[in-house]
UniProtKB/Swiss-Prot annotation:
Belongs to the ATPase A chain family. It is a multi-pass membrane protein. GO terms for molecular function: proton-transporting ATP synthase activity, rotational mechanism. It comes from Brassica tournefortii. The keyword Transcription regulation does not apply. It comes from the Eukaryota. GO terms for cellular component: mitochondrial inner membrane; proton-transporting ATP synthase complex. This is ATP synthase subunit a. The gene is ATP6. It is found in: Mitochondrion inner membrane. Mitochondrial membrane ATP synthase (F(1)F(0) ATP synthase or Complex V) produces ATP from ADP in the presence of a proton gradient across the membrane which is generated by electron transport complexes of the respiratory chain. F-type ATPases consist of two structural domains, F(1) - containing the extramembraneous catalytic core and F(0) - containing the membrane proton channel, linked together by a central stalk and a peripheral stalk. During catalysis, ATP synthesis in the catalytic domain of F(1) is coupled via a rotary mechanism of the central stalk subunits to proton translocation.
Amino acid sequence: GFAWTMLCMNEIFYFIGALGPLFIVLALTGLELGVAILQAYVFTILICIYLNDAINLH
């Protein structure tokens, strides 16, 4: 509507408006990958702790 027409009137804003969603998607994908790596790290540490406790009974 009106906002898109105003963005298209200036080429600089059109360029930013065209690439803005791409950068947002890339940032969210990077954040998601970072969270996945952190979850894998925590899972590995917890597995090591649990296995250590299971093997070395006190």
